[in-house]
From Swiss-Prot:
It is found in: Cytoplasm. The lineage of its organism: Bacteria, Bacillati, Mycoplasmatota, Mycoplasmoidales, Metamycoplasmataceae. PROSITE patterns: RF_PROK_I (PS00745). NCBIfam families: prfA, PRK00591.1. It comes from Metamycoplasma arthritidis (strain 158L3-1) (Mycoplasma arthritidis). This is Peptide chain release factor 1.
Length: 355
């Protein structure tokens, strides 16, 4: 790790020198490239520079402690050793985390889909509750939500809702929501007060950059157009502006009906299809390279990542055994759970890296 950090520091300092040269401003493309590269390693380089400074001060105080007889200087040296030791431990942990391979999708916008799974109408109602939770979370984090497609449940909620979330590092936070969410509560239609268990599945996909090559040939898809309702189902569109695209080979069906025109709906549907096909390609590559077992989300009750227990006002994330007040989380306060999941992911990566 130390050798890697030395190389990063030297590269950072070299790039900083390049950015001070007057001639670099004559080539904007080169300047932008160097500036971007410089910024990408700045956090690691600065942390390591601070670590080296703390280490130097620590060693100097150690030397004073060994050779000095003045009690006041000895006391100051001991105090500095404690301070620098604490700082070095903190910076070492920070450097380990910064050196971990970053998820290339963390800065991307996301495409989310919520479906009612087990439990019939109650599963659909719960899907609606989850969507409201994500709406509040996104509002608190200045993320923008745009509904692409929705199918209302017969008793409320959604049997399916698809939406795009845009904002800074959206995927880094919402990627942990993917999986089966289980709810335990007494449905409004339950006359004997019995607790029912239902589930909803949440899919989270990163938006695929335009420069990523995912071939979608006209002969590979079937495009249907139909009359759509407006956003939220409040107004009926009198033209066939909604678009449904079926990918013949995979059977993936994507619908977009909340854009203003058929052209825009087609573009949005193709964007979602591209993200789904890219996900399949990435999973296939991972299985080939790492021998990973493909986990298919079926919405089965046993494949749960989180349980929402209404009678006990408790939400539990089973991946990390973390519990919080359900009422608070349903108001969009997901940060504590997400922060705990991020910390757990970092710890696993550090362990795997052998730091």
């Amino acid at each position: 790790m130390y050798t890697s950090l030395i190389s990063i520091k030297e590269k950072y300092e070299l790039l900083a020198q390049e950015l001070t040269k007057l001639e670099i401003f004559n080539d904007i493309k080169k300047y932008t490239k160097i500036q971007k590269e410089h910024a990408s390693i700045e956090d690691i380089a600065i942390a390591f520079i601070n670590y080296l400074a703390a280490e130097s001060s620590y060693n100097l105080s150690k030397e004073i402690l060994q050779n000095e007889k003045d009690e006041e200087l000895i006391a100051l040296a001991k105090e500095d050793i404690d301070e620098q030791s604490t700082l070095m431990q903190k910076l070492e942990q920070e450097l380990k985390e910064l050196l971990l391979p970053q998820d290339e999708n963390d800065n991307k916008n996301v495409i989310m889909e919520i479906r009612g799974a087990a439990g019939g109408d109650e599963g659909d109602i719960f899907s609606g509750d989850l969507f409201k939770m994500y709406q509040k979370f996104c509002e608190a984090n200045d993320f923008k939500i745009k509904i692409v497609d929705s199918v209302y449940g017969t008793a409320g909620g959604y049997s399916r809702i698809v939406f795009i979330v845009k904002g800074e590092k959206v995927f880094s936070k919402l990627k942990f929501e993917r999986g089966v969410h289980r709810v335990q509560r007494v449905p409004q239609t339950e006359t004997q007060g019995r607790v029912h268990t239902s589930t909803a599945t949440v899919t989270v996909l990163p938006e695929v950059d335009d420069d990523v090559k995912i071939e979608i040939r006209p002969e590979d898809i079937e495009v249907d157009v139909f009359r759509s309702s407006g956003a939220g189902g409040q107004s009926v569109n009198t033209t066939d502006s909604a678009v449904r695209i079926t990918h013949k080979k995979t059977g993936i069906i994507v619908t977009s009906q909340d854009e203003r025109s058929q052209i825009m709906n087609r573009e949005t549907a193709l964007k979602i299809l591209k993200a789904k096909l890219y996900e399949i390609e990435v999973k296939k590559r991972e299985e080939e390279e790492q021998g990973l077992r493909k986990l298919a989300g079926t919405g089965d009750r046993s494949e749960k990542i989180r349980t929402y227990n209404y009678p006990q006002d408790r939400i539990t994330d089973h991946r990390i055994g973390f519990s919080l007040s359900l009422k608070n989380v349903m108001e969009g306060n997901l940060d504590k759970i997400i922060d705990a999941l991020i910390a757990d992911e970092k710890a696993l990566k550090i362990k795997a890296a052998g730091f």
